[in-house]
Structures are given as structure tokens and as C-alpha cells.
Amino acid sequence: MISSLLSRSSIARRAVRGFASTAVQLDASAKLNKPARFAQPISASDIPKGFVVSSTYAGIKAAISPKPADPNTSASTAAASNPNPKPDLALIVSTVPAAAAGTFTRNVFKAAPVVVSNQVLLDGAKKEQGARVQTVLVNSGCANAVTGTQGMQDAESCVELVKKHLAPHPGLAQSSEGRETLLLSTGVIGVPLPMPTIKRCIPHLANGMILRSDPESWRETARAFMTTDTFPKLRAKTFKLGGKEVRMIGIDKGAGMIHPAMTGPAVPSAVSSGQLHATMLGLIATDAAVQPKALQVALNRAVSRSFNCISVDGDMSTNDTIILLANGQSAASSSTAVANEIDESSPDFEPFVSELTAFCQELSKLIVRDGEGAEKFVEITCTNAPSYTVAHGLLSRLVTSMLFKCAIHGQDANWGRILASVGGADPSLTKDVDASKVSVSFVDPTGEFESITVLRDGNPVKVDEDEIGKLLTKEDIKVVIDLQNGKEDCTYWTCDLSREYIEINADYRS
């Protein structure tokens, strides 16, 4: 009799939760409208001085699609059905050679553009003036990854084409020093770039007449980064260093194949595959004057607390790259002047790192917000850990747990999945975790609902299922894991796993 009543009670709870979940999902569908909520305009006054951009539609994905063209559809008819296609090829140019830094995927199967860009920064670091770059070429639709010798040749051809066709632009420095080009590619893996298409479009992009630096041009450039993204991820801001105004602008993309673990430029033998986790790409440009070595240190620190702390589906891309350019034009008296550069000993270095880190976190969280099919945004903090490495490693394990992500999607406070995942991490991470000290809480970042502790000092806490159920209906949810065994902390950002994620990735190449 008792077991029968318990069974009926369980069925009733599931039914109520099911009705509530359906209602919330319908409500979420109406509210999610990510482009309207997160695609923000930028102010012209926040655009860094000395950078110009151009973009165009090349038809890259259409050129490599395995889906045969409809013989009954003419080219003119196809064009008419999509009169304003999304750009898929873009050029970002600094009017003077800019200090450059980058972080790149640790995936063993690094894409050709990653290898080429990594080498440019390595070679530049050996020079007296450090790594200097003037242009970045971006394409979406084709990753140029796992494409063998042909892929490397195509990447190098892109660099040469940009050098050849970059027309003189008003104020564009013509010195041969520092006129290097970096590459960013995203899209389908295992297919070569459609070089006839690329060769046709680069001269157009490099034409000084269309290189501009207005908000709309930057927005179109951000759209050129997009694959399964639902909105262009573009942000810009102005801040002060040493009492002087400097500007920073950033573009990133990503919605799937997101679990970066990037490192700075390194020779292949010096980088392990790490934790093998659509590609995450990012470009940040500032008119602050920062010495290249210091710029790389700043980017490494910022990325470790931002882009390397996000996950959508646990898969590391072959193409993950973040590029940072600093051209020093904020304090320039002319288009070719470069102010004294900040180094690691400068009083402005730590403030710059702080501003950069906050900016990277803002950009990286947009990727999670736009996670393929995502309906929930989850912030997870591991506090009082013995080291940052331990905290980061435990969270990196948790955010790849399909059971945890499904529970979040279903608004089910099944906190046992959190502990099962964290506890199953590598022994090198868990050896200093004392299960009898761990506490877990669910938090509403908006403050509408009170925080609810479900585990305290290793012991479960009886909670009101209705109250925690209400908290989990929120779009934004925070989970706090307190190890009570140190002073370090780490925060990760992830999303739920929905049916739409499967639908998107089942049809990715078509």
C-alpha cells in the first residue's frame, strides 16, 4: 500500500513538473529571441582608431556543400531567393603594424590557418620589435581543417593574396616591416577552401575604397564570422589608461563545438593535446599601445578566465583562435606615430589586463548565450579550492556532463549528477577534495528567489521541491560548489542540452 502511494506521488510530481516544464518552454520560446536581446549596436566613439574593415559574400559554404545543386534552379533564381546573403569573408586592417598576440587550440588536428597564424607570431616574437601584424583575413563556411598539404598551401596562398592586393588606404603605412597577415577560418572540417572563390573576392576586400571603420561596417564584419550563430557577437568600449582614453572592439563567434582549451603560440612539440574538447573564433582590437610580449601575457591571463571557461557541448575545435591587436593609435599625433608601449613593469599593465579580462568574459558569455538550441545560461563557481587548476579541472569535467545538462534543461534539481561528475574527474584533481566538506547551492542571479543549499558539509539538505523548482524555471541559473579546502576559485559558463541541438547538428553540412 505504502509503495503504491509513493509510486502515485512520484507520478503526480512528474506530471506537475511536466506541465510546468512545457509551459515554461513555450514561454521561453517566446522570450529567447536572442538576436533582439543580445545583438547590440556599437557607438562610433568606441571604435579604436587606426583600424578599418571590409566584408563580402563569397558563397564559400555553397561552393563546398555536398548537397547537389537543383538542376531546375538557375543561378539567377537562387540569387533572387536570397538577395542579401550573410557575408562570409572579411578583412581587418590596422593602418600601422600592430602589436599582436594570439591563443590557439590544443587539438592535435590543428587547422591550416591555426598553424600559419601560430607560426607568424612565433617568428615575430624572435624579432627585436616583437610580433607585429597588419591584417587579419576571416572566412566562415569552410574550416580548412584536416585538409593536408593542400590546406597549408591554400592558407599560405591567402596570405600572399592579401599582401599582393591590399591597396594603399589613406594613412595606411607602407613599410614592409610588420605587414604580416593572420588567418581565422570556421565551418565544415575536411573540405579544402574553394580557392577560385577566395581569389576572386580578396582583391575586392583589399580595395582601399571599401575599407571603412563605421559601426555598420564592423557589424557586417562580425556577421562574416558567423556559422550557426543566431546573432553577430560584437562589443566595443572606451576606458582610461594612465588618465588617457583608449578604445577596444571585439568580435567572436561560436554556438557549437565549444569547449576551448587554448594556449599561446608554441611549436607543435611543446604543446600537448590537453583535454580534447562550431568553432570558437575571436578578434579583439585596441588602440592602446602595448608591447607585443606584454600583450601576449595579458591575453593568456584574460583567456584563462574567460574563453577557456566556457562550454556548449564539450568538443574542442580544430580552429579555436583568439587574436589581439594593439596599434597604439589612441595617443598618436599622426597616422604613423606609435606611443610609448606598455610593458609588464608599467603601472598601466595590470589595469589593462583587468579591462581585457572583463571584455573577454563579456564576449565569451555571448557564445554560451547563443549555444546551439540553448534555453538556459548556467554559471558554475567552484570556491575555496586548493588551486585554480583543481577548480578549473573539476568544472571542466562537470560542464561536459550530458546528465547534468539534461537535468538543467528539464528544470530538475538532480544535484547528485553534479557530485557524480565532479567526483569522477582525474585523480590528480580529486586527490585533495574532501567529500565530507563539500557544499552545493543553487542561486538565482537576479535575486528574485533565495539561494537554496542542497548539500552542506557532505550531507544532503532537505529542501522544498516547489521552491527549487521555481528557481530552476529561470533562464539564468548559478551553481556554487564549495570545496572548503583552499582559497582559489574558478567560474565556468555553460548551457543546457535541448532537442534543438540535435536537430542543428544532424543537418550541419546541408
UniProtKB/Swiss-Prot annotation:
HAMAP family on file: ArgJ
EC number: 2.3.1.35, 2.3.1.1
UniProt PTM: The alpha and beta chains are autoproteolytically processed from a single precursor protein within the mitochondrion.
Keyword set includes Amino-acid biosynthesis: yes
Gene Ontology MF, one: glutamate N-acetyltransferase activity
Associated pathway: Amino-acid biosynthesis; L-arginine biosynthesis; L-ornithine and N-acetyl-L-glutamate from L-glutamate and N(2)-acetyl-L-ornithine (cyclic): step 1/1; Amino-acid biosynthesis; L-arginine biosynthesis; N(2)-acetyl-L-ornithine from L-glutamate: step 1/4
Class in the EC hierarchy, top level: transferase
Record's miscellaneous remark: This protein may be expected to contain an N-terminal transit peptide but none has been predicted.
Top-rank taxon: Eukaryota
GO cellular component labels: mitochondrial matrix
GO biological process, one term: ornithine biosynthetic process
Locations listed in the record: Mitochondrion matrix
Name of the protein this chain belongs to: Arginine biosynthesis bifunctional protein ArgJ, mitochondrial
Positions with a binding annotation for substrate: 227, 253, 279, 372, 505, 510
Reaction(s) catalysed by this chain's protein: N(2)-acetyl-L-ornithine + L-glutamate = N-acetyl-L-glutamate + L-ornithine; L-glutamate + acetyl-CoA = N-acetyl-L-glutamate + CoA + H(+)
Feature type site, description Cleavage: 278-279
